[in-house]
Design a protein with these regions (language model features):
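N-terminal glycine-/serine-/threonine-rich beta1-alpha1-beta2 phosphate-ribose binding loop
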Residues: 2-130, 139-154
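Short beta->alpha connector loops at strand-helix junctions that form conserved
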Residues: 131-133, 159
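Conserved PLP phosphate-binding loop immediately N-terminal to the Schiff-base lysine helix
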Residues: 134-139, 164-165
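Predominantly a Rossmann-like dinucleotide-binding segment in NAD(P)-dependent oxidoreductases
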Residues: 37, 150-156, 161-256
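Short glycine-enriched loops at secondary-structure junctions
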Residues: 111, 134-135, 188-193
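Flexible, glycine- and charge-enriched loops at secondary-structure boundaries
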Residues: 107, 134, 215
């Protein structure tokens, strides 16, 4: 597998011209968006965007027609132009990425499709915003980074917890110097999903948790912690250690 870049000297915009951490692009007066994945997260994103100025929803894509129709109705109720709809085929999302009248692809599908969709969208000239986690393996992460650097497209993982009130207040306090020189942070995220497990299409999230051990979804705790430590803004991770306790309650839940 590919060696991590952190084994090399620190990456800066001067030592690595292709770095996209500080990427800037020409402003877009009206951002034209294609949405892929219209489950709970995607539908909520559509609702939020009905309140945004300077955007146009150009495409709605999901495996299921009823979800596409529901989001189309949401646009109609907000007096927004009708979007082109895509559904039914597992590969129909590629047609959204291939359009020449879309600036941004917003991805809210199951996890395993995130990286391939991000890469395909950037390769077709689109900026990308993707729900967490952005990728499921280190190889996928590097492919996403390489594609962003090569295509010079924005590629953002939508880690929402860094914008929550507690986290953003804590970050502001840290940046104001209230905690002095920060040398240690802790982050955690506890969320019981028992009530919503059945809502995931084809039970994909439960199936992934059954097949994989460890913290498969660490971004809610890690994102705010990285901001407090100025990761990618003057500091970097050299290594990462993950530990896993026995899954006790989930097998009991499955038995029931």
């Amino acid at each position: 597998s590919r060696a991590p870049r952190s084994s090399s000297p620190a990456i800066t915009s001067t030592s690595l011209p292709t770095d996209v951490v500080g990427l800037t692009c020409e402003p877009i007066e009206t951002v034209r968006i294609g949405f892929i994945g219209l489950g709970a997260r995607g539908t909520e994103a559509i609702r939020r965007f009905t309140y945004q100025k300077g955007i146009q929803v150009k495409a709605l894509c999901d495996l299921n027609q009823f979800r596409v129709d529901s989001c189309q109705n949401m646009l109609s109720r907000a007096n927004m132009p009708e979007a082109t709809t895509y559904y039914g085929s597992e590969d129909v999302w590629k047609q959204v990425c291939e359009r020449d009248d879309i600036d941004l692809i917003y991805i809210a599908t199951d996890w395993i499709h995130h990286a391939p969709m991000m890469i395909y969208a950037m390769e077709h000239g689109k900026h990308v915003a993707c729900e967490v986690p952005a990728a499921m393996t280190l190889d996928e992460i590097w492919k996403v980074i390489d594609t962003a650097e090569r295509t010079r497209k924005h590629c953002m993982m939508l880690e929402n917890c860094v914008y929550d009130f507690f986290e953003i207040t804590t970050l502001n306090m840290a940046q104001q110097g209230l905690f002095g020189n920060i040398t240690h942070v802790k982050g955690a995220y506890n969320h019981c999903l028992y009530d919503i497990w059945p809502d995931y299409n084809a039970d994909w999230r439960m199936q992934y948790n059954m097949a994989h051990r460890g913290d498969v979804y660490p971004t809610h705790g890690m994102g705010p912690a990285c901001q407090l430590l100025d990761i990618h803004r003057g500091d970097r991770m050299k290594y990462l250690v993950a530990m896993d306790s026995d899954p006790v309650s989930l097998p009991d839940y499955l038995d029931k």
